[in-house]
């Protein structure tokens, strides 16, 4: 089994390193199962060191000149050759536990796609209330935050990707 992690990134030099480190550490959950993982950063016409930082962290870098997140995700997915895609925003830090949950969902054989709720690093009363409301609605409606989505590659390609 091969997992392709796609990170759309526009001027993310300040946050991308932590994201890549988190993904590399969390990916051990896949390695424990004998699965492989590739990391693809889709540089979305950045003017900073985003692409160079990604390359230095051993990520494959592809480019999407039109600055739009759906296009960046689709370009990254087109370059992927994994059985499953995981889309992670460049300011997110998914951990090993989340990757282990994804692996369990994949292994169940009952899943084509899934995602995660949101937790913010910095909290405030208003911010916590907004995040809590979003997570509640997400669970009720079976929505996923765009910051972490996974799906079977064949299903993603069949529906034509993001729009």
Where are these regions (language model features)?
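Short, well-formed alpha-helical segments that are part of the catalytic scaffolds
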Residues: 12-29
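Short aromatic/hydrophobic "clamp" motif used to bind/position activated sugar donors
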Residues: 85
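Conserved donor NDP-sugar-binding/catalytic core segment of glycosyltransferases
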Residues: 97-126
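A conserved acidic beta->alpha catalytic loop
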Residues: 22, 43-51, 92
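Cell-envelope/extracellular polymer assembly enzymes that use nucleotide-activated donors
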Residues: 2-4, 38
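Acidic donor-binding/catalytic loop of UDP-sugar-dependent glycosyltransferases
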Residues: 49, 88-104
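Short beta-strand/loop segment that forms part of the nucleotide-sugar
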Residues: 21, 31-45, 62
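Glycine-rich, basic loop-to-helix element that forms the pyrophosphate-binding segment
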Residues: 64-80
């Amino acid at each position: 089994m091969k997992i392709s992690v796609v990170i759309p990134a526009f001027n993310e030099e300040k946050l991308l390193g932590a994201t890549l480190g988190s993904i590399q550490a969390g990916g051990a959950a896949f390695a424990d199962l004998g699965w492989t993982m590739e990391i693809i950063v889709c540089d979305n016409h950045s003017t900073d060191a985003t692409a160079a930082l990604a390359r230095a962290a051993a990520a494959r870098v592809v480019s999407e000149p039109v600055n739009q997140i759906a296009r960046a995700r689709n370009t990254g997915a087109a370059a992927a050759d994994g059985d499953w895609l995981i889309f992670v925003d460049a300011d997110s830090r998914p951990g090993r536990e989340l990757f282990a949950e994804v692996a369990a969902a994949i292994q169940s054989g009952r899943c084509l796609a899934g995602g995660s709720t949101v937790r913010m690093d910095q909290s405030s009363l208003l911010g916590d209330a907004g995040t809590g409301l979003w997570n509640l609605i997400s669970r009720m409606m079976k929505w996923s935050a765009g910051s972490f989505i996974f799906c079977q590659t064949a299903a993603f390609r069949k529906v034509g990707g993001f729009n």
